[in-house]
Amino acid sequence: MRQLIKYGKKRLKKAAAGNDFFQKVPEELPQEDLTAWYLRNFGRIINTDCAKMAFIKDGYMPYDPESVAKFHPDSSAVVKLLISKMFAEISPGKTVIFMAGGNGSGKSTFCDGIRPYLEGDWVIDATLASLEAAHRTLEEVFAIGANAVIIHIIRDPEEAWENGVLKRAAHGSHCTPRNVFEFTHKTVADNVATLEQEFASKGLQVYRIENK
């Protein structure tokens, strides 16, 4: 895990030096089996905003806040299918990585760095702003004998807003409303601390990485 984290941190440094990461829209059109389409294009890194790209042909516009909200239920349904597939495929001893951090903190950039080295592991690339959902998924992970890791990317909120949220929106990637942004940055650290305490006895590992 420590080596995997080194790859992620290296990618964050490249972004800080100007080599930003913006998730591109796949050239392959979505197929009837959205989970297979997703895995071919994004790998085992589960991300709601990537799932929304399956609906561009249906009118999804990542730069439009109303469109982002409109297609959130559809993309959430795809994510649920992917998580079901994850639990069907992952074997005991493998790892599920839970990303955590406010919007624009650099989670997906970090994931871009570890993507080639995941092997049989999976990543849930989300903010971890929902304590209930994270708790439920962690319970399932440990129930099947897999390992769980939380990687919390920490970034100054205004830096995350200016050089994370606004910059990616300017490049045509997904936008984030300010109120959602503020909620995640206020909530995530407490959620990580709560989960760390509750699941310590089951072997949950937590890594906190500052993205400066």
Regions inferred by a protein language model and the residue ranges of each:
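Glycine-rich phosphate-binding loop of ATP-dependent small-molecule kinases
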Residues: 1-212
